[in-house]
Amino acid sequence: MVTVDEIRQAQKAEGPATVLAIGTATPPNCVDQSTYPDYYFRITNSEHKTELKEKFQRMCDKSMIKKRYMHLTEEILKENPSVCEYMAPSLDARQDMVVVEVPKLGKEAATKAIKEWGQPKSKITHLIFCTTSGVDMPGADYQLTKLLGLRPHVKRYMMYQQGCFAGGTVLRLAKDLAENNKGARVLVVCSEITAVTFRGPSDTHLDSLVGQALFGDGAAAVIVGSDPLPQVEKPLFELVWTAQTILPDSEGAIDGHLREVGLTFHLLKDVPGLISKNIEKALVEAFQPLGISDYNSLFWIAHPGGPAILDQVEAKLSLKQRKMQATRHVLSEYGNMSSACVLFILDEMRRKSKEEQLGTTGEGLEWGVLFGFGPGLTVETVVLHSVAT
């Protein structure tokens, strides 16, 4: 007779969870940040709000974003005028878009990740799907399973309405699944489309305007598994340690509410200040056991909620400017894509590291950190170990 303990031991993987492939996708419609204020105020019939437009122009100029990708084209917005108004009932119109487009964009990213992984999709044992864009039953996880033709008994996890920290959450969950289920291969997909948050400008809700200046659409997928098959699977990053915490005195700092008018977005406190004030504590908890106290010796992946967060974290920790290079590049080229951002940054980092022959997937360094920041204020921390290139 086999004991429960023996069964448990047999279920566990030998080594740490490892990122084995990454894929990303965006809608084809690309918007230029420098001309976006003109377009945004025209399409929302708000050109008479000249002072507000000047404010928005300044927000866009300071955003450090060059371009973003959006499912919402001028044509779609003209067909759905309620989406362009500031607070018009429009949830049905928004939902009709995102329940189709979120899994579709997710499929595009997942297909690229599976291709890079090089294994048959029948070997995917678990699926984690994450989006803050719309809610449906059965969920986007089910739709993606159908779109990709995954096995019907793939084990699915659907994460709705998590917000910008969730790129860290999905890696934490994938790590636990991979390490506790021998042979598991976890497909992780974050797909975000701003059709739920887009709306016209208002003098009384400037935090909504901040969102209009920052948010973009994108999907990212990773394959995670332990004990990579030699000569078959190519490890990129090892997921060594994870944590999640709610920052003190931060309640209501970032809120989102799903209403008849879509998803409303609220910034109620000094978010960059709260994050920078608490970042060192998170780093000490993560890296003290490894004997690391020089945070410039790490490679950095931080959710680019906005340039002020990155600036204040850099200043607080005396980070060298190049530390946030990959993070700032993704912000500049795509905007804030909520949960998908940190996975885009992982992709950018491994590509750049290979191109520049830096020796490891983490800019030539051995250890790194990935941070997700979002509603709560919630902070996700992931300790990464790079792989030799």
Swiss-Prot record:
MF-aspect GO terms: naringenin-chalcone synthase activity
BP GO annotations: flavonoid biosynthetic process; polyketide biosynthetic process
Pathway in which this enzyme or protein is active: Secondary metabolite biosynthesis; flavonoid biosynthesis
InterPro entries, per database record: Chalcone/stilbene_synt_C, Chalcone/stilbene_synt_N, Chalcone/stilbene_synthase_AS, Polyketide_synthase_type-III, Thiolase-like
Catalyzed reactions: (E)-4-coumaroyl-CoA + 3 malonyl-CoA + 3 H(+) = 2',4,4',6'-tetrahydroxychalcone + 3 CO2 + 4 CoA
Keyword Acyltransferase: yes
Keywords: Acyltransferase, Flavonoid biosynthesis, Transferase
Functional description taken from the UniProt entry: The primary product of this enzyme is 4,2',4',6'-tetrahydroxychalcone (also termed naringenin-chalcone or chalcone) which can under specific conditions spontaneously isomerize into naringenin.
Family per similarity comment: Belongs to the thiolase-like superfamily. Chalcone/stilbene synthases family.
Listed name of the protein: Chalcone synthase 1B
Species this chain originates from: Pisum sativum
Gene: CHS-1B
